Each structure stands twice: as C-alpha cells, then as structure tokens.
C-alpha cells in the first residue's frame, strides 16, 4: 500500500486501483494452493503479491472471455530435481550414488552427535523427491480443470480451455544443474503438453530481475540461454 499511495510511485499502480482501493477483478480468477477467488492483491507468499496480479490484469484486459490463473509455485524448487518431468528420467546413476553417500554420511554424523539411531537413507529415499513438484503441479492443474465450476461459481457451466503455460522457476538450477537445464526444459514442455493433451500449448519462459540492470553471467547466463 505504501508504494501505491506514495507520490513518487503511485502512478505505477494506478491501473490496479480504483477509488483508493485495490481492484477486485470480476473477469479474472485465481487458484493458488489453498486460496482461490477473484484476482486482487494477496495471492503471493503470505502478506505479499506476486507477478500474477499484473499478468492477470493484462490477460483480463486482452481476452473477452473470463480468465483463470492456476498458480502452482513453490520457492526453492529446481527443474533438475523437484520439477523434473517423467521423460527426463533420473540423473546418471553415479550422481544418485553420490547423493546417497552424502545423505547417509549426514544421517550417520547426526546420529553420532545426538546419540540417535535413525535409519540410513536408501536409494529409494533418494529417488522419491525427483519429480514430486511436477506431480503436485499436474494434480493442481487437473483439479482446477475438473472442478472450475465449483471453485468459481460465476463460471459454472462454462467450458475451460487451457490456453497457455508460464514458467517462472529455475533460480536453483544455477547451483550445479545449469548444463542440464536445456535438456530438462525440453522434457518438461513435452511432458506437460502430453499430460494436458495439448500438443501445441504455448509456453512463456519468464526471466527474473534480481540482478537489476546487470546482465546475467556464469551459470545463470547458461540457464537464460537454454
């Protein structure tokens, strides 16, 4: 609210407000984890608003039909591991062996330090997290697709069409997985189109602005160029 009312910045937010209040759209709806409703502020992390507000406003202004945003986002999840899609398979066996060894060493060290007897991780434990966020995301998408009329009564009876997919993740892939990012992204796009039965589904890959006006370099540059 401070930026929206401050003289030096309020013009940036003027199109999102009316009568000194945040606009609540009646033509754009959003589902974000446990929250759902007409698009307005508050659909980011607790007490915050994310890119969905501006994006949804642009989409709502462009389309005559109502718009639903299905936001499935979990911070700190990489495409290499948690968002890894089925056709990408698992990393090379040597990488999994290395991960298993490190996990077992951590548990053994913690057991010794705290006089505990926790079981050492198995290869099954190591493999289980791979693709978990992809599976959760697809379950979230399909739940909204199947139950949009119940979640948003104003849209009851209307046929829902999946019109596009926006990817705004990848920060964590710069920490050792940048060279696999391009391959994993190709698998990701292919699998989503297959799972949603939408072979020509448009994809938009957004770039984050943490570096401000400074160009990306190193691992992040590799990811952006993928």
What is each of the regions a protein language model found here?
Residues 1-226:
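Cell-envelope and extracellular/periplasmic
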